[in-house]
Regions:
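Active-site helix/loop module of the DD-peptidase/beta-lactamase fold
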Residues: 53, 58-62, 74-118, 122, ...
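Cytochrome P450 catalytic-domain "roof"
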Residues: 142-149
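Short, conserved catalytic-motif segment at the N-terminal edge
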Residues: 1-59, 141
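Short amphipathic alpha-helical face segments that pack within enzyme cores
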Residues: 65-70, 158-166
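Residue-level signature of the cytosolic catalytic core of signaling kinases
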Residues: 4, 82, 103, 128-131
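Amphipathic alpha-helical interface segments
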Residues: 129-137, 156
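Cytochrome P450
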Residues: 149-158
Length: 209
């Protein structure tokens, strides 16, 4: 065991033993080589299932960077322009009472969290958030909270809906499919990197409370 591996393992074991973390994994690469691959604690407190090297974790907003990478791939190929309005690719986006304003919102502004659409539909439930069609229709009618580009505000949820729909309109594939085919597969991580996990890997997912 390398010194880095041993030190990392000791730190995360201490965190789980003291109850600061319930379960976690840590991996680190140096010059393309995996130098730390450590895990500790519980993946599921109800069943007692422990974290191991195959455990999958819901990474929430870490997927924003991966989604943005897909946009950059499309831009590099010339199929998407950061500075064109979103409505150029998704015409219905510029709808609703603020249609004229939304017609000016660019792909770049959406990527930079300056589009003015960080809010969610009133009373939206978790199931509603997962309904991409419902969110798409709502975003088409939604009014920006500020003049696009004037302010920055974290689009915690709507980033994925907006950028995901732009990608689908440009490429025809979902973000998840592009990630699987053009990022995860070439990098050899098809069994551990998903945007929309396959049902057959659900048993490996850590349970969040």
């Amino acid at each position: 065991m390398s010194n880095a591996q041993a030190r990392a393992q000791a730190v995360i074991d201490d965190l789980t033993e003291r109850g600061i973390e319930r379960g976690l994994q840590v991996a680190a690469y140096l010059n393309g080589e995996l130098v730390v691959d450590a895990w500790s604690g519980l993946a599921d407190a109800e069943t007692g299932r422990m974290v191991n090297g195959d455990t999958l974790f819901v990474t929430f907003s870490c997927t924003k960077g991966i989604t943005a990478t897909v946009v950059h791939l499309l831009a590099e190929r010339g199929t998407l322009d950061y500075d064109l309005p979103i409505a150029h690719y998704w015409p219905e986006f510029a709808s609703g009472p603020a249609a004229a304003v939304k017609a000016t919102i660019t792909v770049r502004q959406a990527l930079c969290h300056t589009a003015g659409l960080p809010h969610l539909p009133p009373g939206i439930t978790r199931d509603g958030l997962l309904d991409t069609d419902r969110m798409r229709v709502w975003l088409e009618q939604a009014e920006p909270l500020w003049a696009p580009g004037a302010l920055s505000g974290y689009h915690a949820v709507t980033f994925g809906n907006i950028i995901g729909e732009i990608i689908r309109r440009v490429d025809g594939r979902t973000v998840g499919r592009i990630v699987a085919e053009e990022i995860a597969r070439p990098l050899g991580v098809s069994d551990s990197l998903f945007i929309g996990a396959r049902r057959d890997v659900f048993r490996r997912v850590a349970r969040h409370e």
